[in-house]
Amino acid sequence: MPSFKTLDDLSDIRGKRVLVRVDLNVPVKDGKVTDTTRIERVAPTILELSEKGAKVILLAHFGRPKDGPSPELSLSLIAPSVEEVLDHAVSTASDCIGEAAASAVAAMNDGDILLLENTRFHKGEEKNDPDFTKALAANGDIYVNDAFSAAHRAHASTEGLAHHLPAYAGRTMQAELEALEKGLGDPARPVVAIVGGAKVSTKIDLLMNLVKKVDALVIGGGMANTFIAARGTNVGKSLCEHDLAETARQIMIEAATSGCAIILPEDGVIAREFKAGAANETVDIDAIPADAMVLDVGPKSVQAISAWIERASTLVWNGPLGAFEIEPFDAATVGAAKYAAERTTAGKLTSVAGGGDTVSALNHAGVADDFTYVSTAGGAFLEWMEGKELPGVAVLNAAR
């Protein structure tokens, strides 16, 4: 089990300057925040520290600035939404280091919340530059990392600061790490993984790691076609990476060696065009017409997947089973997700899901709140599933 300090380990922090790394990389349209999910996720940590009398100093990046500061990527655009979610005044500073930051921090009272400017306005952030890290650390007494979604990056505000200040995991980071530990670290068995999405090429490391750790691996989405084709079955005009047939075979061999069952679709929903309401039919997977494409797994496959979910004590899910954005090719994803949610709410399954499309798919199915844990961290969640060490997490464990 990862061992890290949490807010429970912080005693008297009244008047202490607490630097909190948060993820405020939210979508903005016409100057307005369109989705406050990430702000809502970090609110408990911020408010807990504020209520305990700390001076709460928020560090975050926003977008990918190319050459220093740019007004459209200023965190001052996000501040009103942060205030709204927290229902608490939030002041801002025009920089995250130097005189502007120092004077804003000096003006704080106990319990105040200050949002410093975009850390990526300085090249030292992404380079994890020691001088830049020291300049950030100068404004704090304690460091709290609550940005799991940026933990796969060894940047100054996500990794470097933990070498300069006492380091703790915030509540979101803590919840994420505890959920992930239940998912793959030390899970209740049997463990079933569902991996979908379009391409095998983006998930080779993930699949290779999972077959060594789970009892069954369900492969869906466009990537299933690559595995089906690798077995010598014609997949018609379906999305398929034929050049990765050998990679798919290697993954299947590794699975057999590790005692992991690979579950591929038995049937598929096919169409001749990729559009909502397109004429479609369900065929066995070895009867795909040459002029058709598979856009979802079929009902027999969903039954088989549900049977594996029923057997499982733990489910890890990344990626949709079909082209869920377009009806009726959302049926398999919705069906399997609803069954997993049902088992979870009945207390019979620990279900952990993550990755951008996965969150959208579970929201589409209306069951995201019924899973044990749904991670909003894209890249960090995938790298964790690939078995890679995350710098932002490793440094918290070291700080223990």
From Swiss-Prot:
Pathway: Carbohydrate degradation; glycolysis; pyruvate from D-glyceraldehyde 3-phosphate: step 2/5. GO terms for molecular function: ADP binding; ATP binding; phosphoglycerate kinase activity. ATP binds at K203, E325, G355, G356, D357, T358. GO terms for biological process: gluconeogenesis; glycolytic process. It comes from Rhizobium leguminosarum bv. trifolii (strain WSM2304). Keywords: ATP-binding, Cytoplasm, Glycolysis, Kinase, Nucleotide-binding, Transferase. This is Phosphoglycerate kinase. The gene is pgk. It catalyses: (2R)-3-phosphoglycerate + ATP = (2R)-3-phospho-glyceroyl phosphate + ADP. Belongs to the phosphoglycerate kinase family. It comes from the Bacteria. Gene3D superfamilies: Phosphoglycerate kinase, N-terminal domain (3.40.50.1260).
